Amino acid sequence: MIQKPRGTRDFLPAEMAQRRFVEQKMRAVAATFGYGEIVTPMFEELELFTIKSGEGIINEMYAFEDKGGRKITLRPEITAAVLRAYVNEAQMAPKPLRWFYFAECFRYERPQKGRYRQFWQFGSELIGADSAAADAEVISLAYELLRCTGVRFVMKVGHLAPMKHLLSGLDAPSQKQVMAALDKRDMDLLGTTLASLDSSDLFEPLKGLVTAKTLPEIFAVTGDIPEKARIEETFGYLEAQNIPFEQNFGIARGLDYYTGMVFEGFADNLGAENQILGGGVYRLAHLFGGKDVPSCGFGIGFDRVLVSLGEITPQTIPVVAVICTPETRIPAYNAASALRSAGITAVMDLLDRGFGAQLSSALKSGASFAVVIGEKEAAAGMITLKDLATAVQTEMSIDNAIEVIHGSCR
């Protein structure tokens, strides 16, 4: 028996209904912020992703040579592809550009709960706006996207300027060692790492960044850095919009990727692997042949959000089983067409079973109503509507049946 590839999944209709339910909620929120959808190719030139991250990332990607000898990869993330599309297609468009995406990505990594080799991201990119208001808008959008799903989460917001200020005396490899320790929130490891770099004097200031609860505490450590006003303004805008967040100036990922504000989101119930959101301010367009442009964006791990949510009950439209005999199939087709035109799901029996078997099948399928058309109903141009929850049935016209079915949803 041929099995699906490791790290992938099949989604049957019930699960797809749940996924689409959450996806549509998120799409609706993005639209209210004025963001339009962008779609990029599922595969891109390999260089698009190695130009910033280096050749080492190849081991994490589905990379290959095509028949023309071109180095291609299935996309491991979306941001680089969106900025490539911007450089190719939209550099002259009026700014700022507000784009969102919902797309599948591929990474060759060890599958585990909530992490797969084929996975979906929902995210946005705001291109061409460099201001505290822009930073706050993107964070607000990320917050509302998560909130609308019903997931329980904590948003953490910081800025890389204080960290970069403290680490400015270290070379790039040393900075990465320190960042690795900070990322693990391991103060013992941080102390050991700094000692090995003859930089133990940085331990207390760095610890202060990680543990500080207020902006005055941060600037007591760093002094009046140039980015102070921008940080205060961004936080002020978030507070004015009643966006709940925790400040975290110890966010250690992406020091060589992000250039300013950074933020993350964590689900309450996913244990150690609980990050479901990551984003910040960056500049990538110039790497892909375009003019330098400020950008800010984020990605949401859609699959991990679904794992956190657990069972979801999508709002469903009524399902009606249309029950007929072989002799009344034509009027049954007409009734089914009328139901579907009214936005009601209508399912017909295809096996020429008796009324009893059809009714039993309808009950097992979860249908809300049955529209029964026997010879008597067909001769009178009527139908019998049966409420499968109460077993009450009434003869009526199909138009009246549609009104009753719609009324049951109110």
Swiss-Prot record:
Entry's SUPFAM superfamilies?
Answer: Class II aaRS ABD-related, Class II aaRS and biotin synthetases
Main location group: cytoplasm
Q: What is its EC number?
A: 6.1.1.21
What are the UniProt keywords, alphabetically? Aminoacyl-tRNA synthetase, ATP-binding, Cytoplasm, Ligase, Nucleotide-binding, Protein biosynthesis
This chain's protein is named: Histidine--tRNA ligase
Biological-process GO terms, alphabetical: histidyl-tRNA aminoacylation
Can the keyword Cytoplasm be found in this entry's annotation?
Answer: yes
GO MF terms here are: ATP binding; histidine-tRNA ligase activity
Enzyme class (EC, first level): ligase
Q: Which reaction does it catalyse?
A: tRNA(His) + L-histidine + ATP = L-histidyl-tRNA(His) + AMP + diphosphate + H(+)
Kindly indicate whether the keyword RNA-binding belongs to this entry: no
Q: Which organism is it from?
A: Methanocorpusculum labreanum (strain ATCC 43576 / DSM 4855 / Z)
Record-level GO cellular component terms: cytoplasm
PROSITE patterns assigned: AA_TRNA_LIGASE_II
- Which residues are listed as membrane-spanning? none
Compartment list: Cytoplasm
What protein family does this chain belong to? Belongs to the class-II aminoacyl-tRNA synthetase family.
What top-level branch of life does the organism fall under? Answer: Archaea
